[in-house]
Amino acid sequence: MATNYSANQYEKAYLPTYLQNWSPARPTKEKIAAHEGYTQIIANDRGHLLPSVPRSKASPWGSFMGTWQMPLKIPPAKVTLTARTTTAADNLTKWIHKNPDLLNACNGLRPEISGKPFDPDSQTKQKKSVTKTVQQAPNPTIIPSSPVIQGDNPDEPQSSHPSAGHTPGPQTPVNSPNNPPPSPCKSTK
């Protein structure tokens, strides 16, 4: 077992030469400059407040709440009501505002309540009132200028489902301004 440890093995890593952050020391003044303003004395040598200092009549420590004065369970500081039901959101906000001393204390709770509660009753009513309309797609048509692909034989029976065949786009004449003639430079294969 190793019994002798040099403190250098710990401190050496933090020396300026090893950290490579050595720089010349800042120049210091021989006499410290006087600060502007003054320090107001509010207590005597024994630590008691002087009579001229205003003091709270309720408590000399202000509104500080000690550990024993706090409630057994402290509510959360940040609350989101978004995923909660209306009754759960009401119970939670009542619990937060139940102890006003905790809310008013200088070291007390500053709750942040955000979001809107979820009402399942209104959601079911909306679902019942909404009716779904299904629109029947028209039968697919075959464009005469399109190339013939296996399965596009007009003799074969066609399915009435829109995804079964070719869904046509807008039809334009072959030599219209929107559809110029093919370029002779491009080879089509």
Curated annotation (Swiss-Prot):
Region (Disordered): 112-189
GO cellular component: apical plasma membrane; axonemal B tubule inner sheath; axonemal microtubule; ciliary basal body; cilium; sperm flagellum
Localization: Cytoplasm, Cytoskeleton, Cilium basal body; Cytoplasm, Cytoskeleton, Cilium axoneme; Cytoplasm, Cytoskeleton, Flagellum axoneme; Apical cell membrane
Entry keyword Phosphoprotein: no
Signal peptide (UniProt feature, chain positions): none
Ranges of compositional bias, category Pro residues: 178-189
Record flagged with keyword Membrane: yes
UniProt keyword list: Cell membrane, Cell projection, Cilium, Cilium biogenesis/degradation, Cytoplasm, Cytoskeleton, Flagellum, Membrane
Purpose: Microtubule inner protein (MIP) part of the dynein-decorated doublet microtubules (DMTs) in cilia axoneme. Acts as a regulator of cilium basal body docking and positioning in mono- and multiciliated cells. Regulates basal body docking and cilia formation in multiciliated lung cells. Regulates kinocilium positioning and stereocilia bundle morphogenesis in the inner ear.
Assembly information from the UniProt record: Microtubule inner protein component of sperm flagellar doublet microtubules. Interacts with DLG3.
Annotated protein name in UniProt: Protein Flattop
Organism whose genome encodes this protein: Mus musculus (Mouse)
Lineage of the species this protein comes from: Eukaryota, Metazoa, Chordata, Craniata, Vertebrata
